[in-house]
Regions:
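Acidic, histidine-bearing metal-coordination/catalytic regions of metal-dependent phosphoesterases
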Residues: 1-84, 99, 103, 107-136, ...
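A short, conserved beta-strand element in the Rossmann-like catalytic core
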Residues: 92-93
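Short, intrinsically disordered, charge-balanced linker/junction segments flanking boundaries
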Residues: 302-317
Length: 317
């Protein structure tokens, strides 16, 4: 049961280039470095400052509690003296779907957002941070759902189980090759369908200056977009680098040798074993009464196991 898959590295790179209009003539003419930014909060030159680091924040609400809300509450204790938050990836589980941004990110971290007192009114692609949360892409932010599972319908038990599994945290859209993340956090320049609008935007928001030229000016509470899927900035005399490691390491193919054949057969066997494990878990899950607290808690455990099994299958493939 292949519920998730990871797009090819060349696809990830090309799609992200299109979204930020990489090397567009209007950008090149202005000498803009699309991999740099400055944080304009009036304090960026101070030598003493603190920041927080989080990651893997994308889990959803579980029985009677929301893990990310509990994390956010702890972070709020340090927010007054904190300049920004670094996010190390996996913003949304399991496949970076836009439909989970309200419940898994906007609502639990609402105090960090402008207008956070009414999180239901904040669109995932229109977030502005009062306290910067500077993100990077995790593998889950690139994952997708096969098209056949978006269109398939039917009354069979197998399909009902699959639909219930989708209801966990997979959704029906996937990340669309990282598009949801890009619209949520990046300066999505592809949205401008007229060059004069693009140039006006560049002249307004790309006024920062670094040794490499002009760059995006990140202004908390006003304009809080990131320039690219990877970027750098300097704060308090320290250089920070955010990388997209999803596009760096492409595993070598298994060689066409006797040893390679053994390895390939072992992986196929492991994949078949995972299919059996998934089916057994779904059968167990189908017997649970989610109105029962003990069963609801057990469902959380089964959901986590299913997610891990799907990640292993993605790695195998």
């Amino acid at each position: 049961m292949d519920l998730i898959f990871d797009p090819a590295i060349p696809v990830k790179i090309e799609k992200m280039k299109q979204r930020v209009q990489w090397k567009h003539q209007s950008i090149v003419q202005r000498g803009i470095d699309q991999t740099s930014m400055v944080i304009d909060d009036g304090k960026e030159d101070s030598e003493e400052f603190s920041f927080m680091v989080i990651g893997d924040s994308g889990t959803t609400c579980q029985y009677e509690h929301h893990p990310q809300r509990e994390v956010a509450k702890l972070m709020l204790q340090h927010r007054p003296e904190c300049r920004f938050v670094l996010h190390t990836g996996d913003v949304i589980y399991t496949v970076g779907s836009r439909e989970y941004y309200p419940s898994n990110f906007i609502k639990p971290y609402r105090e960090f957002l402008k207008g956070g007192e009414n999180p239901q009114n904040i669109a995932y692609d229109n977030m502005v941070f009062d306290t910067p949360i500077l993100t990077t892409l995790g593998n889950h932010d690139y994952y997708d759902v096969p098209l056949k599972y978006r269109a398939i319908t039917g009354p069979t038990l197998k399909l009902r189980r699959m639909f219930r599994y989708h209801d966990f945290e997979i959704g029906w859209f996937g990340s669309e090759q990282g598009d949801a993340y890009a619209k949520a956090f990046l300066d999505y320049l592809a949205r401008f369908n007229q060059q004069e609008k693009l140039e006006s935007h560049l002249d307004e928001h790309y006024t920062g200056k670094t040794d490499s030229g002009r760059c995006l000016r990140y202004e908390p509470g006003h304009f809080t977009r990131l320039p690219n899927r990877y970027y750098t900035f300097r704060y308090g005399g320290i250089d920070f680098f955010a990388l997209d490691s999803n596009t760096i390491n492409d595993p070598s193919p298994i060689p066409a040798t006797p040893q390679g054949d053994i390895r390939r057969k072992a992986l196929i066997q492991r994949r078949d074993e995972i299919d059996i494990e998934e089916q057994q878990i779904l059968e167990e899950y189908d017997k649970l009464n989610l109105d029962n607290p003990k069963d609801a808690e057990k469902s959380d455990t089964l959901e986590a196991i299913l997610s891990q099994l799907n990640e292993i299958k993605v790695d195998i493939e």
